[in-house]
Protein backbone atom coordinates (compact mmCIF):
# COMPACT_ATOMS: atom_id res chain seq x y z
CA UNK A 1 0.00 0.00 0.00
CA UNK A 2 2.87 2.36 0.70
CA UNK A 3 4.70 1.67 -2.55
CA UNK A 4 1.59 2.24 -4.68
CA UNK A 5 0.71 5.55 -3.03
CA UNK A 6 1.73 8.59 -5.06
CA UNK A 7 1.77 11.13 -2.18
CA UNK A 8 4.37 8.88 -0.53
CA UNK A 9 6.79 9.39 -3.42
CA UNK A 10 6.11 13.11 -3.49
CA UNK A 11 6.86 13.24 0.22
CA UNK A 12 10.15 11.40 -0.23
CA UNK A 13 11.10 13.73 -3.07
CA UNK A 14 10.37 16.83 -1.03
CA UNK A 15 11.89 15.56 2.22
CA UNK A 16 9.18 17.03 4.41
CA UNK A 17 8.10 16.23 7.98
CA UNK A 18 4.97 14.33 6.99
CA UNK A 19 6.58 10.91 6.50
CA UNK A 20 7.93 10.80 10.06
CA UNK A 21 4.56 12.03 11.32
CA UNK A 22 2.82 9.31 9.34
CA UNK A 23 5.14 6.71 10.88
CA UNK A 24 4.27 7.93 14.39
CA UNK A 25 0.56 7.80 13.56
CA UNK A 26 1.04 4.25 12.27
CA UNK A 27 2.71 3.24 15.56
CA UNK A 28 -0.23 4.70 17.50
CA UNK A 29 -2.81 2.92 15.37
CA UNK A 30 -1.03 -0.43 15.50
CA UNK A 31 -0.74 -0.10 19.27
CA UNK A 32 -4.43 0.71 19.60
CA UNK A 33 -5.36 -2.22 17.36
CA UNK A 34 -3.29 -4.79 19.25
CA UNK A 35 -3.87 -4.06 22.94
CA UNK A 36 -5.65 -1.72 25.35
CA UNK A 37 -4.20 1.75 25.23
CA UNK A 38 -1.66 2.21 28.00
CA UNK A 39 1.22 4.34 29.17
CA UNK A 40 3.75 2.64 26.87
CA UNK A 41 1.79 3.86 23.87
CA UNK A 42 1.65 7.52 24.94
CA UNK A 43 5.20 8.29 23.80
CA UNK A 44 4.44 8.16 20.03
CA UNK A 45 1.63 10.66 20.48
CA UNK A 46 3.73 13.06 22.55
CA UNK A 47 6.56 12.77 20.02
CA UNK A 48 4.18 13.37 17.11
CA UNK A 49 2.83 16.62 18.57
CA UNK A 50 6.36 17.87 19.17
CA UNK A 51 7.29 16.89 15.61
CA UNK A 52 4.26 18.29 13.73
CA UNK A 53 1.43 19.78 15.72
CA UNK A 54 -1.55 18.43 13.78
CA UNK A 55 -1.89 15.38 16.06
CA UNK A 56 -2.73 17.77 18.89
CA UNK A 57 -6.22 17.09 17.55
CA UNK A 58 -6.00 13.79 19.44
CA UNK A 59 -5.99 15.65 22.79
CA UNK A 60 -9.76 15.32 23.45
CA UNK A 61 -9.52 11.57 22.83
CA UNK A 62 -6.49 11.28 25.09
CA UNK A 63 -8.45 13.05 27.83
CA UNK A 64 -11.40 10.73 27.22
CA UNK A 65 -9.06 7.73 27.61
CA UNK A 66 -7.71 9.12 30.86
CA UNK A 67 -4.19 9.72 29.57
CA UNK A 68 -3.64 12.66 31.90
CA UNK A 69 0.02 11.88 32.44
CA UNK A 70 0.66 12.03 28.69
CA UNK A 71 -1.20 15.33 28.46
CA UNK A 72 0.83 16.71 31.36
CA UNK A 73 4.13 15.53 29.89
CA UNK A 74 3.26 17.04 26.52
CA UNK A 75 2.29 20.36 28.10
CA UNK A 76 5.56 20.45 30.03
CA UNK A 77 7.68 19.59 27.01
CA UNK A 78 5.96 22.16 24.81
CA UNK A 79 6.51 24.81 27.46
CA UNK A 80 10.14 23.74 27.95
CA UNK A 81 11.00 23.78 24.26
CA UNK A 82 8.84 26.64 22.95
CA UNK A 83 8.61 29.28 25.65
CA UNK A 84 12.37 30.02 25.86
CA UNK A 85 12.53 30.39 22.08
CA UNK A 86 9.50 32.67 22.01
CA UNK A 87 11.02 34.74 24.82
CA UNK A 88 14.45 35.07 23.21
CA UNK A 89 13.43 35.59 19.57
CA UNK A 90 11.31 38.72 19.08
CA UNK A 91 8.22 38.16 16.97
CA UNK A 92 8.54 34.37 16.93
CA UNK A 93 5.37 33.70 18.91
CA UNK A 94 3.10 35.82 16.66
CA UNK A 95 4.77 34.28 13.60
CA UNK A 96 4.02 30.78 14.89
CA UNK A 97 0.42 31.62 15.76
CA UNK A 98 -0.13 32.94 12.25
CA UNK A 99 -0.01 29.31 11.11
CA UNK A 100 -3.47 28.98 12.63
CA UNK A 101 -4.83 32.03 10.80
CA UNK A 102 -6.22 31.39 7.36
CA UNK A 103 -7.28 34.89 6.35
CA UNK A 104 -9.51 35.40 3.33
CA UNK A 105 -9.43 32.35 1.03
CA UNK A 106 -8.23 32.63 -2.54
CA UNK A 107 -7.05 30.36 -5.35
CA UNK A 108 -4.05 28.20 -4.57
CA UNK A 109 -3.17 25.55 -7.12
CA UNK A 110 -1.21 23.34 -4.74
CA UNK A 111 -3.80 23.40 -1.96
CA UNK A 112 -5.77 20.14 -2.09
CA UNK A 113 -7.58 20.45 1.23
CA UNK A 114 -11.34 20.41 1.67
CA UNK A 115 -11.52 24.09 2.60
CA UNK A 116 -9.88 25.04 -0.69
CA UNK A 117 -12.44 22.91 -2.52
CA UNK A 118 -15.26 24.73 -0.70
CA UNK A 119 -13.86 28.09 -1.79
CA UNK A 120 -13.39 26.96 -5.39
CA UNK A 121 -16.93 25.56 -5.51
CA UNK A 122 -18.42 28.80 -4.15
CA UNK A 123 -16.39 30.98 -6.52
CA UNK A 124 -17.27 28.78 -9.50
CA UNK A 125 -20.97 28.94 -8.64
CA UNK A 126 -20.79 32.72 -8.42
CA UNK A 127 -18.90 32.92 -11.72
CA UNK A 128 -21.45 30.76 -13.53
CA UNK A 129 -24.39 32.72 -12.08
CA UNK A 130 -22.74 36.08 -12.69
CA UNK A 131 -22.82 36.94 -8.98
CA UNK A 132 -19.86 38.30 -7.06
CA UNK A 133 -19.89 36.57 -3.70
CA UNK A 134 -18.85 38.87 -0.83
CA UNK A 135 -15.61 38.01 0.94
CA UNK A 136 -17.51 37.72 4.21
CA UNK A 137 -19.48 34.80 2.76
CA UNK A 138 -16.31 32.93 1.92
CA UNK A 139 -14.92 33.56 5.40
CA UNK A 140 -18.18 32.47 7.03
CA UNK A 141 -18.21 29.26 5.00
CA UNK A 142 -14.63 28.49 6.03
CA UNK A 143 -15.49 29.05 9.69
CA UNK A 144 -18.58 26.87 9.40
CA UNK A 145 -16.51 24.03 7.91
CA UNK A 146 -14.07 24.14 10.82
CA UNK A 147 -16.82 24.23 13.46
CA UNK A 148 -18.84 21.44 11.85
CA UNK A 149 -15.99 19.00 11.30
CA UNK A 150 -14.55 19.62 14.77
CA UNK A 151 -17.89 19.39 16.57
CA UNK A 152 -18.80 15.93 15.26
CA UNK A 153 -15.69 13.98 16.39
CA UNK A 154 -15.71 15.90 19.68
CA UNK A 155 -19.34 14.92 20.28
CA UNK A 156 -18.63 11.29 19.38
CA UNK A 157 -15.64 11.28 21.73
CA UNK A 158 -17.71 12.28 24.77
CA UNK A 159 -20.83 10.29 23.86
CA UNK A 160 -19.17 6.94 23.14
CA UNK A 161 -19.19 4.73 26.27
CA UNK A 162 -16.97 2.09 24.67
CA UNK A 163 -14.65 3.97 22.29
CA UNK A 164 -13.02 2.02 19.51
CA UNK A 165 -9.64 3.75 19.74
CA UNK A 166 -8.63 2.89 16.16
CA UNK A 167 -11.82 4.43 14.78
CA UNK A 168 -11.52 7.53 16.94
CA UNK A 169 -7.85 8.12 16.14
CA UNK A 170 -8.62 7.65 12.45
CA UNK A 171 -11.54 10.06 12.59
CA UNK A 172 -9.48 12.76 14.29
CA UNK A 173 -6.67 12.26 11.77
CA UNK A 174 -9.04 12.67 8.84
CA UNK A 175 -10.44 15.80 10.49
CA UNK A 176 -7.14 17.58 9.93
CA UNK A 177 -7.52 17.39 6.14
CA UNK A 178 -10.99 18.91 6.33
CA UNK A 179 -10.35 21.83 8.68
CA UNK A 180 -6.80 23.02 8.00
CA UNK A 181 -6.48 25.83 5.48
CA UNK A 182 -3.25 24.64 3.79
CA UNK A 183 -3.19 20.96 2.82
CA UNK A 184 -0.66 19.99 0.17
CA UNK A 185 -0.59 16.74 -1.77
CA UNK A 186 2.36 15.30 0.16
CA UNK A 187 0.42 15.79 3.41
CA UNK A 188 -1.84 12.92 2.39
CA UNK A 189 0.90 10.48 3.33
CA UNK A 190 -0.29 11.08 6.91
CA UNK A 191 -3.71 9.55 6.16
CA UNK A 192 -2.17 6.41 4.66
CA UNK A 193 -1.51 4.73 8.07
CA UNK A 194 -5.22 5.04 8.80
CA UNK A 195 -6.14 3.13 5.65
CA UNK A 196 -3.38 0.56 6.21
CA UNK A 197 -4.59 -0.34 9.69
CA UNK A 198 -8.28 -0.28 8.74
CA UNK A 199 -7.59 -2.59 5.78
CA UNK A 200 -5.60 -4.92 8.06
CA UNK A 201 -8.43 -5.15 10.60
CA UNK A 202 -11.47 -5.32 8.33
CA UNK A 203 -12.39 -6.66 4.93
CA UNK A 204 -14.63 -3.76 4.00
CA UNK A 205 -14.12 -2.78 0.34
CA UNK A 206 -14.70 0.87 1.20
CA UNK A 207 -11.26 1.29 2.74
CA UNK A 208 -9.71 0.03 -0.51
CA UNK A 209 -11.86 2.30 -2.68
CA UNK A 210 -10.83 5.34 -0.65
CA UNK A 211 -7.21 4.18 -0.69
CA UNK A 212 -7.25 3.78 -4.48
CA UNK A 213 -8.66 7.27 -5.00
CA UNK A 214 -6.02 8.81 -2.75
CA UNK A 215 -3.21 6.68 -4.17
CA UNK A 216 -3.83 7.74 -7.77
CA UNK A 217 -2.07 10.83 -9.11
CA UNK A 218 -4.15 13.97 -9.35
CA UNK A 219 -5.56 14.73 -12.82
CA UNK A 220 -3.38 17.83 -13.12
CA UNK A 221 -1.13 16.30 -15.78
CA UNK A 222 -4.18 15.93 -18.02
CA UNK A 223 -5.01 19.59 -17.40
CA UNK A 224 -1.48 20.94 -17.94
CA UNK A 225 0.44 18.29 -19.95
CA UNK A 226 3.09 20.84 -21.02
CA UNK A 227 3.92 21.79 -17.45
CA UNK A 228 3.28 25.48 -18.02
CA UNK A 229 2.70 26.04 -14.32
CA UNK A 230 6.46 25.65 -13.81
CA UNK A 231 7.12 28.87 -15.75
CA UNK A 232 3.82 30.77 -15.43
CA UNK A 233 3.60 31.55 -11.75
CA UNK A 234 0.25 33.30 -12.18
CA UNK A 235 -1.35 29.90 -12.85
CA UNK A 236 -0.89 29.09 -9.17
CA UNK A 237 -3.25 31.88 -8.12
CA UNK A 238 -5.96 31.75 -10.78
CA UNK A 239 -8.80 29.28 -11.43
CA UNK A 240 -8.31 26.49 -13.91
CA UNK A 241 -10.51 26.84 -16.98
CA UNK A 242 -12.95 25.31 -17.69
CA UNK A 243 -14.11 25.43 -14.09
CA UNK A 244 -15.17 21.78 -13.96
CA UNK A 245 -11.49 20.87 -14.35
CA UNK A 246 -10.61 23.11 -11.41
CA UNK A 247 -13.22 21.39 -9.25
CA UNK A 248 -12.23 17.90 -10.40
CA UNK A 249 -8.59 18.59 -9.60
CA UNK A 250 -9.22 20.00 -6.12
CA UNK A 251 -11.78 17.30 -5.33
CA UNK A 252 -9.43 14.44 -6.24
CA UNK A 253 -8.04 14.21 -2.70
CA UNK A 254 -10.52 16.18 -0.61
CA UNK A 255 -13.62 14.14 -1.41
CA UNK A 256 -12.07 10.71 -0.65
CA UNK A 257 -10.99 12.01 2.77
CA UNK A 258 -14.47 13.42 3.31
CA UNK A 259 -15.88 9.98 2.50
CA UNK A 260 -13.44 8.41 4.98
CA UNK A 261 -14.48 10.92 7.65
CA UNK A 262 -18.19 10.22 7.10
CA UNK A 263 -17.72 6.45 7.09
CA UNK A 264 -15.70 6.49 10.32
CA UNK A 265 -18.18 8.84 11.98
CA UNK A 266 -21.03 6.51 11.05
CA UNK A 267 -19.17 3.45 12.34
CA UNK A 268 -18.68 5.21 15.68
CA UNK A 269 -22.17 6.73 15.87
CA UNK A 270 -24.12 3.59 14.98
CA UNK A 271 -23.71 1.79 18.36
CA UNK A 272 -24.28 5.10 20.18
CA UNK A 273 -27.60 5.54 18.39
CA UNK A 274 -28.50 1.92 19.15
CA UNK A 275 -27.89 2.58 22.86
CA UNK A 276 -30.05 5.68 22.72
CA UNK A 277 -32.88 3.66 21.25
CA UNK A 278 -32.51 1.28 24.19
CA UNK A 279 -32.62 4.32 26.52
CA UNK A 280 -28.98 3.94 27.51
CA UNK A 281 -27.28 7.32 27.62
CA UNK A 282 -23.69 8.26 28.32
CA UNK A 283 -21.87 11.57 28.46
CA UNK A 284 -18.25 11.79 29.49
CA UNK A 285 -17.21 12.97 32.06
CA UNK A 286 -20.58 13.73 33.65
CA UNK A 287 -22.14 10.28 33.50
CA UNK A 288 -21.30 7.65 36.09
CA UNK A 289 -21.08 5.51 33.04
CA UNK A 290 -22.20 2.53 31.13
CA UNK A 291 -19.86 -0.43 30.87
CA UNK A 292 -16.76 1.29 29.55
CA UNK A 293 -14.43 -1.61 29.02
CA UNK A 294 -12.98 -0.67 25.68
CA UNK A 295 -9.27 -0.44 24.94
CA UNK A 296 -7.77 2.62 26.49
CA UNK A 297 -10.58 3.41 28.89
CA UNK A 298 -11.17 2.66 32.52
CA UNK A 299 -13.95 0.27 33.35
CA UNK A 300 -16.66 2.09 35.25
CA UNK A 301 -19.73 0.79 36.99
CA UNK A 302 -23.20 1.16 35.59
CA UNK A 303 -25.98 2.36 37.81
CA UNK A 304 -27.42 -1.14 37.77
CA UNK A 305 -24.24 -2.75 39.07
CA UNK A 306 -23.91 -0.10 41.78
CA UNK A 307 -27.47 -0.78 42.90
CA UNK A 308 -26.82 -4.53 42.90
CA UNK A 309 -23.78 -4.14 45.13
CA UNK A 310 -25.70 -1.97 47.54
CA UNK A 311 -28.46 -4.55 47.65
CA UNK A 312 -26.00 -7.36 48.44
CA UNK A 313 -24.41 -5.21 51.14
CA UNK A 314 -27.77 -4.60 52.77
CA UNK A 315 -28.42 -8.32 52.88
Regions found by a protein language model. Name each.
Residues 17-26, 53-56, 187-196, 256-257:
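Hydrophobic core segments of transmembrane alpha-helices in multi-pass, intramembrane catalytic enzymes
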Residues 45-62, 179-190:
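Transmembrane helices and adjacent periplasmic/lumenal helix-loop junctions
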Residues 42-45, 93-100, 188-196, 208-212, ...:
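A cytosolic-side transmembrane-helix exit/cap motif
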Residues 23-35, 61-66, 192-205, 259-271:
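Transmembrane alpha-helices and membrane-interface helical segments
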